[in-house]
Amino acid sequence: MELDECLERLYKAQLLPEVTVRALCFKLKEMLVKESNVIHIQTPVTVVGDMHGQFHDMLEIFQIGGPVPDTNYLFLGDYVDRGLYSVETIMLLIVLKLRYPSRIHLLRGNHESRQITQSYGFYTECLNKYGGNSRVWQYLTDIFDYLVLCCIIDDEIFCVHGGLSPNVQTIDQIKIIDRFREIPHDGAMADLVWSDPEENNNPTLDHPDNSGQHFQVSPRGAGYTFGRSVVEKFLRMNDMNRIYRAHQLCNEGYQIYFDGLVTTVWSAPNYCYRCGNKASILELYSKDQFYFNVFEEAPENKLLKENSMNDNALEDSISNPVANRKLIADYFEDDSASADGSTDPEMYIFSDVYQARSASNRHVDYFL
């Protein structure tokens, strides 16, 4: 099947045959293996945050931000899980990358992981859509191992899914990471996709710990939280001026930290079809000219919830019943959770960490 024919089908949310998925994944591996852990691109570019299988919202992005290849896009990761159309979402991005390799750039997020996707929807979705076998999931999660970790725009803007790491002081240290594997539980690679900036909630983040670093172990169970001093040091050492990242739900679609040194971009509106948040894409015209294009959910999502599914069925579809569905429901009943969109701890993948922390803190999340 030709790439343009694949695109025509995918834009209509039609599944591709398994044999085609396999062939496309093989071609993309051949392309991605040639890319460095850190890619360099130039403005103008539009930066996209978490999508989480919200396929119709991704189509909305191509409407408001411009179609490919007219617009140059950088996606910051987390393409799958939670939304009902993770397969269609990642497949469209794969084919667009193959068709327009210089106009679509894909970073790896913490959900581009075999372990995570077995618990938070993507694995089950692949089984349901491809006759109960896991081969398509295997093809796609193999692709995840080839996705790049970071991007630098105009030699001055550092882009990553999550955040910084106490194991990384320079860009050169990122370039030598062995990325062609499952995301480990700890270390530099894990930190890049799991860590978060934290501005107001913990002032001790700007004071060094015993090792002389300005990091604290993240409540997510992986990665770290880090303060302004970490950001300033990293930017100074690498001659950068700011950081763009995703990974955290923002009620207004984006959030700015440390007087503009760090910006979070969130691109999944009404996350999980019920959070009510806005989303944004960051249109970067030059290093000093940019615009947050804020948008709301696509009409198809409203129809999906109103006409196709009741709340229980929707919840069944966006979460693996084995993966603490009751806790997810409890989260949504807690009106105080993420009220300002700035704090949203993960539902911890490491069960022992999760059990200890959830017992003392009901403010759990649905795995961003």
UniProtKB/Swiss-Prot annotation:
Enzyme class: hydrolase
Modifications after synthesis and translation: Reversibly methyl esterified on Leu-368 by leucine carboxyl methyltransferase 1 (PPM1) and protein phosphatase methylesterase 1 (PPE1). Carboxyl methylation influences the affinity of the catalytic subunit for the different regulatory subunits, thereby modulating the PP2A holoenzyme's substrate specificity, enzyme activity and cellular localization.
Alphabetized InterPro entries for the sequence: Calcineurin-like_PHP_ApaH (IPR004843), Metallo-depent_PP-like (IPR029052), PPA2-like (IPR047129), Ser/Thr-sp_prot-phosphatase (IPR006186)
Residue sites binding Mn(2+) 2 per the record: D78, N110, H161, H247
Residues holding Mn(2+) 1: D50, H52, D78
Catalytic reactions on record: O-phospho-L-seryl-[protein] + H2O = L-seryl-[protein] + phosphate; O-phospho-L-threonyl-[protein] + H2O = L-threonyl-[protein] + phosphate
Keyword line: Hydrolase, Manganese, Metal-binding, Methylation, Protein phosphatase
GO biological process entries: asymmetric protein localization to old mitotic spindle pole body; glycogen metabolic process; negative regulation of mitophagy
Enzyme Commission numbers on file: 3.1.3.16
Cofactor(s) required for function per UniProt: Mn(2+)
The organism's place on the tree of life at top rank: Eukaryota
Record's GO cellular component terms: cytoplasm; FAR/SIN/STRIPAK complex; mitochondrial outer membrane; nucleus
CC cofactor note: Binds 2 manganese ions per subunit.
Active-site positions on this chain: H111
Pfam families assigned to the protein according to its UniProt record, in alphabetical order: Metallophos
GO molecular function: metal ion binding; protein serine/threonine phosphatase activity
Description of how the protein assembles with itself and partners: Inactivated in a complex with phosphatase methylesterase PPE1 (PP2Ai). Interacts with phosphatase 2A activator RRD1, which can reactivate PP2Ai by dissociating the catalytic subunit from the complex. Interacts with TAP42.
Note: Present with 1960 molecules/cell in log phase SD medium.
Function: Involved in glycogen accumulation.
Homology family: Belongs to the PPP phosphatase family. PP-2A subfamily.
This protein's name: Serine/threonine-protein phosphatase PP2A-like PPG1
Origin species: Saccharomyces cerevisiae (strain ATCC 204508 / S288c)
